[in-house]
Amino acid sequence: MASSKTLLFTSECVSESHPDKLCDQVSDAILDACLANDPYSKVACETASKTGMVMVFGEITTKSSFDYQKVIRETVKRIGFTDSSIGFDYKTCNILVAIEQQSPDIAQGVHVGRSDDDLGAGDQGHMFGHATNETPEFMPMTHVLATRLCQRMTEVRNNSILSWMRPDAKTQVTVEYRNENGTLIPLRRHTVVISVQHSEDVTNEEIRKRLMEEVIKPSIPAHLLDGETIFHLNPSGRFVIGGPQGEAGLTGGKIIIDTYGGWGAHGGGAFSGKDPSKVDRSAAYAARWIAKSLVARGLANRALVQVSYAIGVSHPLSVFVDSYGTAQGGRTDEDLLAISKSNFDLRPGKIINDLQLRRPIYEKTAYHGHFGRNDPDFLWEAPKKLNF
């Protein structure tokens, strides 16, 4: 148990082959196909998957022409479902497409006849961004480590290091922290959970041994592991049936994994399958940009940013900043709010232009998290120079 001066917090991650993540990637692959030849495409694409079936449905208005079947099958192939013996096969799965055009009621209220800068929010809602200085990524340690384990399992499987490893996998990490007046200090890794799909012909003993050698040790700094760290490696004892055969998948089923692993807050709106006129996505990216900029510039050790919108209205209804009491240099949260408002234009059209969100960059956001990644296309991860 953690001492009275410390706390335990847990985050989870899933591989790109988890059925919900498969659906996220299919939805975003379709979004990218739309944006590739029509940057102003309006896309709201949902995906569902189950044994031998992928269904995409929603509303899309685009000038792009592409083969839905090809996009979906290539995405499923990249994810790793290449043979029916592992529960799903991109070559033979049934694909259903039920796509209509965007509602004209939404179009007239949001973008028709309006300049880019005056673009209205695509819906109402509230979105959050979070940042913390506990890792170089300015992300929570629990989330970083859980994600790193999934990334490593993808490397191991793609490089055929463990022949028995199959695509579906989940991780979970509990970290013991010390809270120093709102600043979180990671002390040690308390518990590690890994569940990975496997072939019939491998023993649990072999799975646990090899996960420790090939996944955990290469992924986690040694100083965070100690003799008291608890490991639950394939604790169910059997995980042969996985992917959509094991459970149904839906777009937006892993919104906490997509963001901050349970830290901060979440407005409830998923990201994948939505073009940037949907503030569920674009404003959440902007809120992360603000939070990371505040922390990276040393104005706070932690930051939570909330923005809210009404459909068809370009300016946000509210902006909120909470530093958890960690504002630096004698500043207050009110000071950080003023700095945020003076440095960031949170109208949807300005967010889209500043972060170049009309590019086809979204499929790769749909696995291993939208935040804390070193990718030059993810402009919301580049701290802005702040004037104050």
Curated annotation (Swiss-Prot):
Enzyme Commission designation: 2.5.1.6
Binding-site residues for L-methionine, renumbered to this chain: 59, 102, 278
Organism: Acanthamoeba castellanii
PANTHER family: S-ADENOSYLMETHIONINE SYNTHETASE
Cofactor(s) demanded: Mg(2+); K(+)
Record's keyword terms, sorted: ATP-binding, Magnesium, Metal-binding, Nucleotide-binding, One-carbon metabolism, Potassium, Transferase
UniProt entry tagged with the keyword Metal-binding: yes
InterPro entries assigned: ADOMET_SYNTHASE_CS (IPR022631), S-AdoMet_synt_C (IPR022630), S-AdoMet_synt_central (IPR022629), S-AdoMet_synt_N (IPR022628), S-AdoMet_synthetase (IPR002133), S-AdoMet_synthetase_sfam (IPR022636)
Function noted in UniProt: Catalyzes the formation of S-adenosylmethionine from methionine and ATP. The reaction comprises two steps that are both catalyzed by the same enzyme: formation of S-adenosylmethionine (AdoMet) and triphosphate, and subsequent hydrolysis of the triphosphate.
The protein, known as: S-adenosylmethionine synthase
BP terms from Gene Ontology: one-carbon metabolic process; S-adenosylmethionine biosynthetic process
